[in-house]
Each structure stands twice: as structure tokens, then as C-alpha cells.
Curated annotation (Swiss-Prot):
Its EC number is 1.17.99.9. The lineage of its organism: Bacteria, Pseudomonadati, Pseudomonadota, Alphaproteobacteria, Hyphomicrobiales. This is Heme A synthase. Its cofactor is heme b. It is found in: Cell membrane. The gene is ctaA. GO terms for cellular component: plasma membrane.
Length: 367
């Protein structure tokens, strides 16, 4: 019978303790990034809800950090805004002081985005150079950083759609911008969750992991639909619930031709589809909870299923309240925040079925 080498065991334990310390540091960093991303999405939502997104008409990645500091600079910034259709057709009576109100939202949104790039890139470089990032995570983290750079380009692509002909941004580009933000958020959540300890409870059923994936993906699709609602101001189309214009299925959902374009450009149809998406997500999380409670009651997986259902139910209630009150700013932002919370938890729940990343020493022993 082989006798374990005490020196080898001590070396393994020492390496595992170091990895655990490194993982705690990475979790703290990624958690801070997630919080910053959450704030960025909320400020972006406020920018949209206050119609502030076209107030800055130029893309200045570096010196755009500095806002106008003098009356002359404010006049110049306002003059640039006066050139676009939004001002000419909708805000022609706006004063410089009123312009400042919409300018600060867009400026804050861009500033936070730049700041996130810094708080992601600099620690990534530091952790990489000091050997604190496990090899399996290096390129996924670089990929997230690259997506962040791409997201900046998508943001300007979105803004540019409202600078020449339209008086607002394209709902398609707005949805792309929000979905990309959610994908970056999901990537950080996925890695952070993998660096955390997991329960040893077995999945309730063999299909639990796939069902969790379906819920997370559908949550993202529902956010995409919500972005179309925001882009088309579709939240103002029907402000009643549960009926729409006194009917379960309104009569004017397919008035545009070709008929399929209604799903993307008819505000009433877009709101209808978003409602159906909410009912579907509610049903999916309810079924998931019932299955988990029946197959594996009081396990970690069952508790997560309960919490996910509760979050979706609260989000649905917030959505209904927002609709009935005709989308006041604070309720609209609460609804957007709830969407990101639901999606983030759905991703964490999905990742929970894969377990913690194995330690390097465990891999070496297995090999």
C-alpha cells in the first residue's frame, strides 16, 4: 500500500489555499464589475426614458470625458444638437438650460461605460501578470473585454441612427445594444459563479440543466422584446391589463404589410408579444419550481428554483404596474432593473448545475 508523501500533501494544500485566495480576489473584482454594469444599464435606461440619447452628437472616445465647462462650450454643444431632426421636429423650443438636463444623462452613460473598461482591463492585466488567473479563464476574460470594446462601437452605431433622418434611434440597434450589455453581464456572472463553491446536491432531474438553460435564454429574449417596446414607445399603446383595448387579442396587431413586420415595427404588436413572453417566462419558472420541489425538495436546486420563480413573479407585477401608470421614469427603471436581476439569477442558476471550476491540483492528481 502506497504511503502518501507528507511534503507532497503540504505542497498540494498550499497550492489550493493560494488558488482559493486568488479566486476570492477574482470574485470580488467580477462582482464589482457586475455592480458597475448594473448601474450602467440603469443609466442607459434612464437615458432612453428621458429621450436623452441623442443629446451628444459626436463620438469622442478620449476627450469626450470632459463635459462643456463654459457658457461658450455649452452653446457649441447645443448648436450641434440643433442640427439633428430630434431638435428641429420635436424640441425646437428647447433652451440651453433644458438641453443640459438631457445632456448629463447621456454623458453619464458614456462616462460609466468608459470607467467600466478601465476597472475591467487594468485588474485583468494585473491578475494575469501576477499569475492569479487560471489558464482556463484567461481568454474568456479577454473575450469579455473585447465584447466591451465592440459594445462601445454598437452604442455609437445606435446613436448615429437618429442623427440624420429619424427623431429617435433605431429600435433594432437599441435592442442589439441592450442584448450585448446583457451578454457581457452574463459572461462575468458565469465566470464568477464558477469560481464560487457549489452544493453537492444532485440535479432534481436529468433535464434540469437544459431547463435552466432554456429559462436563461428566454429571459434574454424577453429583454430583447422589452428593448423593442422601449424603442417604439410601445408601453403607451395599451395601458390596461389583463385586456388590451378591451380584448384578449386586439384586432389591429397585423395592420402593417408584410404581416411579419408588425412583430418589430407595430408598437401594439410588440407590446402584445412582450406580454406573451412574460406569461411564458412565468409558466417556465413555475414548472421548473414544481419539478424541483417534487424531485428534490429542500435541496439547493429547489431553493434556487423557488427564488427564480419569486423574482419573475415580482418582475411581472412591476411590469403591470409600470404599464398601468403609463411608464413613469422610476417605475420604468425599476422594471429594467428587475429584468437584469432575473436574467442574472437565471444565468447563475444555470451555471450552478456545472459545479465549481476544478482546482489545478485536482486536475494534476487526476491526470
Amino acid at each position: 500500500m502506497a504511503v502518501a508523501n507528507p511534503t507532497t500533501e503540504q505542497a498540494i494544500l498550499s497550492e489550493m489555499r493560494k488558488q482559493n485566495r486568488d479566486r476570492r480576489a477574482l470574485r470580488f473584482w467580477l462582482g464589482f464589475v457586475l455592480l458597475a454594469l448594473f448601474c450602467l444599464v440603469l443609466v442607459g435606461g434612464a437615458t432612453r426614458l428621458t429621450n436623452s440619447g441623442l443629446s451628444i452628437t459626436e463620438w469622442k472616445p478620449i476627450h469626450g470625458v470632459i463635459p462643456p465647462l463654459s457658457a461658450a462650450e455649452w452653446e457649441e454643444e447645443f448648436r450641434l444638437y440643433q442640427r439633428i431632426p430630434e431638435f428641429q421636429q420635436l424640441n425646437s423650443s428647447m433652451t440651453v438650460d433644458e438641453f443640459k438636463g438631457i445632456f448629463w444623462w447621456e454623458w453619464a452613460h458614456r462616462l460609466i461605460a468608459r470607467a467600466i473598461g478601465v476597472i475591467f482591463a487594468l485588474p485583468l492585466i494585473y491578475f494575469w501578470l501576477t499569475g492569479r488567473i487560471e489558464k482556463r479563464l484567461r481568454w474568456p476574460l479577454v473575450g469579455i473585454l473585447a465584447l466591451g470594446g465592440l459594445q462601445g462601437g454598437i452604442g455609437w452605431w445606435m446613436v448615429s441612427s437618429g442623427l440624420s433622418v429619424r427623431t429617435d434611434v433605431s429600435q433594432y440597434r437599441l435592442a442589439t445594444h441592450l442584448v450585448m450589455a446583457c451578454l457581457i453581464f452574463a459572461g462575468c456572472m458565469w465566470i464568477m459563479r464558477g469560481l464560487s463553491r457549489h452544493s453537492d446536491d444532485p440535479p432534481p432531474t436529468r433535464s434540469s440543466r437544459g431547463f435552466a438553460a432554456a429559462i436563461a435564454i428566454f429571459s434574454l429574449f424577453q429583454i430583447y422584446l422589452g428593448a423593442l417596446v422601449a424603442g417604439l414607445d410601445a408601453g403607451f399603446s395599451y395601458n390596461t391589463w389583463p385586456l388590451m383595448d378591451g380584448a384578449v387579442i386586439p384586432s389591429d396587431l397585423l395592420i402593417q404589410q408584410p404581416f411579419w413586420i408588425n412583430a418589430f415595427e407595430n408598437p401594439k404588436t410588440v407590446q402584445f408579444i412582450h406580454r406573451i413572453g412574460a406569461y411564458t417566462l412565468f409558466a417556465l419558472t413555475l414548472i421548473n419550481m414544481v419539478i424541483a420541489l417534487r424531485a428534490a425538495p429542500w435541496t439547493t436546486h429547489a431553493r434556487r428554483a423557488i427564488l427564480l420563480f419569486v423574482l419573475v413573479t415580482l418582475q411581472a407585477a412591476i411590469g403591470i404596474a409600470t404599464l398601468l401608470m403609463q411608464v413613469p421614469l422610476h417605475w420604468g427603471l425599476l422594471h429594467q432593473a428587475g429584468a437584469l436581476v432575473v436574467f442574472g439569477f437565471a444565468v447563475a442558476n444555470w451555471r450552478g448545475f456545472y459545479g465549481e471550476y476544478p482546482h489545478g491540483t485536482m486536475i494534476a492528481e487526476r491526470d
